[in-house]
Amino acid sequence: MNNILITGATGFVGMQVMKALDNLKNVNLFPIVRTKKKNIFKKFNNVKNIYFTKDIFNESEDWWKKKLVKIDIVIHIAWYVKHGKYLDSELNINCLYGSLRLGNAVAKSSVKRFIGIGTCLEYNLKKRKLRVNTALDPKNLYSITKVALFTSLQKLFLIKKKEFVWCRLFYLYGEGEDERRLSAYIHKQLQNGLPAKLTSGNQIRDFLNVRDAAKIISNISLDKKVGAINVCSEKPISIKKFAQRIAAKYGRLDLLKFGRKKNFLHEPDIVWGVMNYDKT
């Protein structure tokens, strides 16, 4: 039986990881949630206990040590990811400090395996294909603090003989997505018969359904593979074609308005991941 503690369990990615793990045998789940979300896991079979916090990133190392008793695996998903604000928010620093306290507590505990969540934005995005050995070159506070956590925990857990996995997520979409994100925004606009104002759409991205990403994360949490993992589709597609696929389901290609928004400054032309983990 594997006792798994999960942070960020109610979020976009975390909820799907919870659902994926809840379908597996020999798993006990211990999600950490904010106090106001007490009843969210009522229908989950594998949830054995729920830990509550007002602010996970302000908890002390001693608080974490108590929560880690009898835990075998930690999946750390929690982070500040408010749409439109997270990339250069100073709250990334709080997330880094809080995550390092968790890491220190894990290093001193009986936990065997730690899965952290990173981002494709850690890489040098001038490269055409992004492999786990592609040079890192983070450009914003979000990716910089993620790299800082990755490099710190990688060394710490090597010293302490803990298994460490770092899952770099690419462009996820699907259930529970913030309605301001690309896929959810297009769905919302077309459902209401409204135009979806988009950029040129020429950018190439590696999109993956969050459910598929969650399956990869849940599977690797119970695996023996260690190190950095790209969680991606390996199927690059232009934003224009991605949007057109969604619009085709509604029969409303006419509502896609490309070029109505400016492309983001310094936005990469291509973000294309190469998997290094057997998704099956």
Please identify what each model-predicted range represents.
Residues 76, 100-141:
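Conserved Rossmann-fold NAD(P)-dependent oxidoreductase catalytic core, especially the SDR/UDP-sugar
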Residues 26-37:
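Conserved glycine-rich Rossmann-like NAD(P)H-binding loop of the short-chain dehydrogenase/reductase
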Residues 53-94:
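NAD(P)H-binding glycine-rich loop region in Rossmannoid oxidoreductase-like domains
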Residues 95, 141, 145-148:
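Active-site helix of classical SDR
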Residues 190-280:
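C-terminal substrate-binding subdomain of Rossmann-fold SDR/epimerase-dehydratase oxidoreductases
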Residues 7, 32, 74-78, 114-120, ...:
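SDR active-site strand-loop-helix element
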Residues 151-205, 210-214, 245-247:
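NAD(P)-dependent short-chain dehydrogenase/reductase
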Residues 4-24:
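N-terminal Rossmann NAD(P)H-binding glycine-rich loop of SDR-like oxidoreductase domains
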